Amino acid sequence: MNGMGERDELLMLAVRDGDVAKLGLLFDRHHRVLFDYFARMTGDRAAAEDLVQDVFFRMLKYRKTYRDDSRFTAWMFHIARNARIDHHKKRRGEVMFPEEGMEVPSRSPFPNQELEQQQETGLLQRALFKLSEEKREVLVLSRYQEMKYEQIAELLGCEVGTVKVRVHRAIRELREVFFKLSGEKASWNAKKSETSLRII
């Protein structure tokens, strides 16, 4: 069996038990998700690429810690968070700003609308990086990674209610920062942009 139809958990159990080639299948499935997480948390594409590689290196190194009842995605993101925290410690004191081109390209067939959406997405990324790391992370996990509150609570080691409160506060602050950067009032029409709607 080539492993293409196997669940992540079964693949990781195979890696743990010595079939390390299966890690390549897990990489193919999850490297984009991890890159998106790291890119939005660090604002640095090169660092995001390095961190993705680091996660899979750590998976291989610590494969024996993977338990029979572990959920692969939760285990993977625990490793990813540790890798990001270590990276942050090394770069402590540096001011992070999202790189040019970090925005998700628009698919709008209308040039003016596309430009407007790109500008709003850029503002949204700038606003995101003005939040604390804790608030930025809960937004990245809940909105970009589309993780359920229960999954985030498990990852962060807190109650589901705590996650809901953190997300609510983070969205409120992000909205305030976004409006401040854009110079628009809080009465801004939410239907104006699907791009911004995804977060605020």
Region locations from a protein language model:
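Amphipathic, Lys/Arg- and hydrophobic-enriched alpha-helical face
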Residues: 27-45, 62, 128, 177-180
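Structural recognition of an alpha-helix C-terminal capping motif at a helix-to-coil junction
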Residues: 36, 50-57, 70-82
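Internal acidic/polar
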Residues: 4-8, 94-117, 191-198
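N-terminal module of bacterial RNA polymerase sigma factors
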Residues: 1-33, 126-129, 190-200
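DNA-recognition helix of helix-turn-helix
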Residues: 85, 135, 144, 150, ...
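Amphipathic alpha-helical segment used for protein-protein interaction
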Residues: 13, 17-20, 92, 107-140, ...
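Short, charged helix-capping/linker segments at alpha-helix termini
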Residues: 2, 16-25, 35-54, 160
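Arg/Lys-rich amphipathic alpha helix in sigma70-family domain 2
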Residues: 61-68, 78-98, 109, 117
